[in-house]
Amino acid sequence: SDVIRYPDSVEEKVVLEKIEELNKDISVSGILVQLPLPKHIDKQKVIEAIDPSKDVDGFHPMNVGNLSSGYESSVPCTPLGCYLLIKKIEPNLSGKKAVVVGRSNLNGKPMTQLLLKENCTVTITHSRTKDLKAECLEADIIVAAVGIPELVKGDWVKKDTIVIDVGINKTDKGIVGDVDFDEVSKNAKALTPVPG
């Protein structure tokens, strides 16, 4: 794989021209644009310039639509990795109650679509959800991807819950996730560490 680096001062036109060149290059099978972009570059315009079949992140509107419609599409790597890990722990997800804490286009929404595809009952929550603890206590699966250090506490998680922590937060203690690992590990069937 090749990495193409530009200074923050790069013109949007230069980035779009490079994407078009890569789209046409049959030796290139995937394109990933590292976000966030400099403020003067229109993120949506850049994402939409990528050929959907080469969109590694799955951010192109066609891929987002295909995923939410249940069609074949590129899936962002973090939700896909979380999904595969959950399936390894619990192969039959049908009928399971899942709570996704976070509604981002990068993690929360794609994760929701993947779990729905497995016939889970999914509740999408976020930092402003009223009584988030009560929502989590109902869950067989919790995916925390909200960007709040150690938000999910031990008394939010019932026994034998699968807990996937996507959060990466810098704190005085160092890097921590969105889940209080020490507390939640007492109840969880499986729990991902951060960092890990």
PLM feature segments, named:
Residues D8, P76-I162, G174-D182:
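Glycine-rich phosphate/diphosphate-binding loop of Rossmann-like nucleotide-binding domains
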Residues S1-L32:
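N-terminal ligand-binding/catalytic initiation module
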Residues S29, D140, K189:
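Conserved acidic residues
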Residues P36, A145-I148, G167-I168, G196:
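Short glycine-/small-residue-rich Rossmann-like dinucleotide-binding loops
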Residues L32-L93, M111:
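Anion-binding alpha/beta catalytic cores of soluble intermediary-metabolism enzymes, centered on
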Residues G30-V33, A144, I164-D165:
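Redox-cofactor binding/interface segments in oxidoreductases and associated redox assembly factors
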Residues L32-P36, V101, V194:
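Short beta-strand segments
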Residues K43-H60, V64, K159, I164-G196:
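Rossmann-fold NAD(P)-binding glycine/threonine-rich loop
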